[in-house]
Regions:
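Acidic (Asp/Glu)-rich catalytic clusters
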Residues: 126-135, 160-172, 212-217, 253-255, ...
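Short, acidic/polar
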Residues: 120-132, 201-211, 276-289, 363-372
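Aromatic-rich peripheral "rim/lid" segments of glycoside hydrolase catalytic domains that contact
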Residues: 200, 214, 228, 232-247, ...
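Substrate-binding cleft and catalytic face of glycoside hydrolase catalytic domains
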Residues: 137-150, 160-270, 341-343
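Aromatic-lined carbohydrate-recognition surfaces of secreted/lumenal glycan-active proteins
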Residues: 115-119, 224, 245-280, 332-345, ...
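Long amphipathic alpha-helical scaffold segments
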Residues: 58, 64-122, 129-130
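Amphipathic, heptad-repeat alpha-helical segments
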Residues: 2-60
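Substrate-binding cleft/loops of secretory-pathway carbohydrate-active enzymes
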Residues: 267-300, 392-393
Length: 451
């Protein structure tokens, strides 16, 4: 019932006898439920009665699996414990989100820059613009490859068109990333310098100077970098990464000291770090930037599921909530600068959340995860990862995260997002324990749906 998801075990000491994978996955799920109940002060069954019921059943199945007479019985009981445990942890995560969401927005409305989306600069504002009216802000990707396809020849046609549209409509803009070394980000003529930073640094600076000078008065927040810590374009010394970020940061401050700056991190789960040489974890990277004295106003986090790239594969709601909890206590506000799920299956390894990915399943995921994220008091805003499919294609080779078709036709997730944003334009009122709620409409801002 949970789908095809990435799960984990507890840290296991080496031993001669092989571990039973299903049993250890169930053990970790039991541990996660207990740990988060303690962390969130959710031990009272009245806060999440369905979660408590499923946990008790999962614990009984796990206990029986530990003393099962044979491996077949153990496997069946462990599988049942995993299934029930997944239900329990997801229900706990959503119950906790419901409480915090009402605590945060019970007496006040959400800010005027709560919900955004990422557009594809190659699309036509006249066609896509009307579908952006319900969103508070817009992220405009800036790709060096498209702006300077020939060295020294800059083409700002697409960016000018969208920045003009944003100015005319009064939409706040997040622009960037300015520094991006991922595959396909560099112009063809600059690829020969990919691993020669001394030669790449000057043309990179020239590009940054052109972009920042042109748009400094029109951009509300600059996304300086996105996922540089993962070294997806090949190994790169951290000193070069820091130098590139510092160059962009100082250039922005030189033109406008009050300009807001953001650093975006990818793969909060550490999948890429374990696979790609030279990569470091998102949280370690942020600590390193702080130690180097780099200044930025916000942290951006990419939270993608259903993709084929490590760090974007399907995961359960509790894992997503727990990953966001790791930002608690950071002095910088958090933006979910790219949050999304696909509307179709993207291939082997992408997984699925319950049923296969479809437009309706994408909408159901959004109705759960967006309220869950906004319930975190340190989350400042959320941007959907792709307004149309080609805005931020899955690095694994496919695209399908859009909430609007290329011709401007909305998908079901679009309606869910607009409905949630509309709901947060007025106070939610006090939280009422489960069982005392009147029937809720599907996909309301509190995260309850007919799912």
């Amino acid at each position: 019932r949970a789908g095809d998801l990435i799960l984990q075990t507890c840290l296991l000491p080496p031993r001669e006898k092989p571990y039973d994978l299903a049993l250890e996955l169930a053990r970790h799920r039991m541990k996660t439920y207990i740990h988060k109940c303690e962390d969130w002060l959710m031990f009272n069954p009245g806060f999440a009665p369905f979660a408590a019921e499923h946990f008790e059943r999962a614990r009984d199945a796990f206990t029986e699996a530990l003393v099962a007479p044979d491996l077949d019985a153990e496997g069946l009981l462990a599988a049942s414990a995993i299934d029930l445990g997944m239900q329990a942890t997801d229900e706990l995560a959503m119950a906790h989100a419901d409480i915090l969401l009402h605590r945060r927005y019970g007496k006040k409305t959400a800010s005027s820059t709560t919900l955004g989306t990422i557009i594809d600069p190659r699309t036509d504002p006249a066609l896509i613009g009307p579908t952006l009216e319900a969103f508070d802000l817009v992220t405009v990707p800036m790709r060096w490859r498209e702006v300077e396809s020939k060295r020294g020849k800059y083409d700002f046609t697409a960016l000018d068109r969208w920045l003009t549209w944003a100015h005319d409509t009064g939409k706040p803009i997040i622009a960037g990333p300015l520094v991006d070394f991922s595959p396909g980000a560099l112009p063809d003529w600059a690829e020969v310098f990919r691993f020669d930073y001394a030669s790449l640094r000057d043309p990179l600076y020239d590009y940054l100077e052109q972009v920042v000078t042109r748009y400094i008065k029109h951009v509300g927040m600059w996304k300086i970098s996105a996922g540089l810590h993962l070294c997806r374009g090949g190994p790169r010394p951290i000193t070069e990464v820091i130098d590139a970020i510092r160059t962009a940061e100082l250039l922005i401050r030189r033109h406008k000291r009050t300009a807001r700056r953001m650093i975006e991190v990818h793969d909060l789960f550490g999948d890429t770090t374990a696979r790609v040489s030279g990569s470091i974890g998102a949280f370690e990277f942020l600590e390193r930037l702080g130690a180097e004295g780099l200044r930025f106003d916000s942290i951006g986090a990419r939270l993608i599921v259903g993709g084929t790239e490590p760090g974007t594969r399907s995961r359960d709601l509790m894992t997503l909530s727990d990953s966001l909890d790791r930002f608690f206590g950071d002095e910088h506000p958090l933006l979910l600068s790219a949050c999304g799920a696909p509307c179709r299956d993207l291939g082997e390894g992408a997984g699925r959340w319950g049923e296969a990915w479809t437009p309706d399943r994408q909408a159901s995921w959004a109705a759960k995860v967006i309220p869950m994220a906004l319930s975190k008091p340190y989350v400042e805003a959320i941007c959907w990862s792709a307004h149309t499919d080609n805005a931020t294609p899955d690095p694994g080779g496919e695209s399908g995260f859009g909430i609007v078709e290329e011709d401007g036709t909305p998908r079901p997730a679009f309606a869910r997002l607009v409905s949630m944003r509309r709901r947060l334009r007025r106070p939610l009122g006090p939280w009422v324990p489960p069982g005392a709620h009147p029937p809720a409409q599907a996909g309301d801002a509190s995260g309850r749906s007919d799912e």
